[in-house]
């Protein structure tokens, strides 16, 4: 508890001091806009915390998951501007890097601009590798005219402030969301986004652009084990469909003990909403490790058996098998478990047609 209070105090101090510093150092040839005043999408719940996945005070979240749920994972900002260049200044709470993801994934920004109805990659906000204060150009030298922009936030850090910078005198305004539906994803580190190259390259973000839907991301690295607090979040959330990567962190015993109650709770809260469960990945780190192979085989076997039974009992529950799919050539992950960009593409090629077919039944298209 003391550690959490210290962390929250640090966040408050960082937010106050850096906002003052940035305001005092604004360049005379740039205008700045607080991103939280623009259109925020991919939130599971509209809770007044625009740059955090959730307001954790609303739930009984265990200590090990609280920080993860205050991260900006999956959140994006929609805005319109006629600026010929776009940049950003933002602050995060944690320095340092991990071993199985890029600095862009953890701390960077990812900008897309809509062109002829499609979201097209435009540039990235390159984060500092030494500090929690970041400044970066995103795109320069654009043609004149209004652009419709979508800016993805860092995937594995808490963002305490974000300002978008544009040419002096340029228009920046909230963009009405073009997304009519919301498909919420819940799961493990794979759903969290590990190990896509950048925030907009995760399978959840790409799914959203491909199907033209909002995609709140409640993927928590190493922590999705069919726990009650995940069910609490799902029950409180408002979405047109839910997709679950629920077996990647769960042992076979977790699945046996918790799956039925988990399904009962979420279907009671959302009786007419499609609940789509994905089979977990066939892990390449188990190719020669017999212990890892036994664990992965047990996960997959129990998940398949129980989901077959559950799907026969609940008309709005579905099981996609294979689900998360890295391919059969052993080249689809960064470390034998987490999808690289090739694995992301293969997973999307596998699940998108199947999920589209399910969603069509509910007039979600």
Model-assigned labels for residue ranges:
Residues 3-10, 20-182, 358-365:
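N-terminal secretory targeting modules
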Residues 98-100, 193-201, 294-297:
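Glycine- and acidic-residue-enriched helix-capping/strand-helix junction motifs
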Residues 180-204:
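Catalytic nucleophile-elbow at a beta strand-turn-alpha helix junction centered on a G-D-S/GDSL motif
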Residues 204-217, 308:
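Short helix-loop-beta junction
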Residues 207, 224-260, 265, 280-286:
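Oxyanion-hole/transition-state-stabilizing segment in secreted/luminal serine hydrolases
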Residues 270-275:
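A short helix->loop->beta-strand "cap" motif at the edges of active sites that frequently abuts
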Residues 283-321:
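Substrate-gating cap/lid alpha-helix
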Residues 334-365:
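Histidine-centered active-site loop/cap adjacent to the catalytic His
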């Amino acid at each position: 508890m003391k550690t959490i209070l210290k962390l929250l105090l640090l966040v408050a101090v960082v937010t106050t001091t850096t906002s003052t510093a940035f305001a005092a150092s604004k360049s005379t040839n740039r205008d700045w806009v607080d991103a939280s005043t623009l259109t925020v999408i991919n939130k599971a719940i509209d809770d007044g915390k625009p740059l955090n996945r959730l307001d954790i005070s609303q739930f009984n979240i265990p200590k090990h998951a609280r920080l993860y749920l205050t991260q900006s994972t999956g959140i994006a900002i929609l805005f319109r501007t006629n600026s010929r260049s776009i940049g950003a200044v933002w602050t995060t709470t944690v320095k340092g890097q991990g071993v199985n993801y890029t600095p862009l994934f953890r701390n960077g920004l990812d900008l897309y601009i809509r062109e002829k109805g499609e979201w097209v990659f435009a540039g990235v906000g390159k984060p500092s590798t030494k500090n929690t204060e970041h400044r970066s150009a995103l795109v320069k030298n654009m043609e004149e005219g209004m652009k419709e922009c979508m800016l993805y936030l860092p995937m594995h850090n808490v963002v305490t402030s974000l300002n978008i910078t544009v040419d002096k005198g340029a228009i920046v305004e909230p963009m009405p969301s073009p997304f009519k539906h919301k498909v919420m994803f819940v799961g493990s580190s794979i759903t969290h986004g590990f190990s896509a190259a950048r925030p907009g390259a995760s399978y959840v973000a790409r799914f959203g652009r491909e199907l033209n839907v909002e995609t709140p991301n409640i993927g928590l690295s190493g922590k999705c084990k069919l726990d009650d607090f995940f069910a609490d979040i799902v029950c409180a959330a408002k979405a047109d469909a839910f997709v679950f990567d629920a077996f990647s962190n769960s042992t076979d015993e977790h699945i046996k003990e918790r799956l039925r109650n988990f399904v009962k709770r979420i279907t009671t809260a959302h009786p007419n909403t499609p609940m789509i469960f994905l089979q977990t990945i066939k892990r390449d780190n188990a190719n020669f490790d017999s212990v890892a192979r036994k664990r992965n085989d047990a996960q997959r076997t129990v998940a398949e058996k129980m989901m077959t039974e559950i799907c026969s009992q609940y008309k709005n529950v579905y099981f996609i098998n294979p689900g998360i799919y890295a391919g059969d050539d052993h080249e689809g992950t960064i470390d034998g478990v987490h999808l690289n960009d090739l694995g992301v593409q293969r997973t999307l090629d596998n699940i998108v047609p199947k999920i589209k077919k399910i969603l069509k039944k509910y007039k979600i298209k």
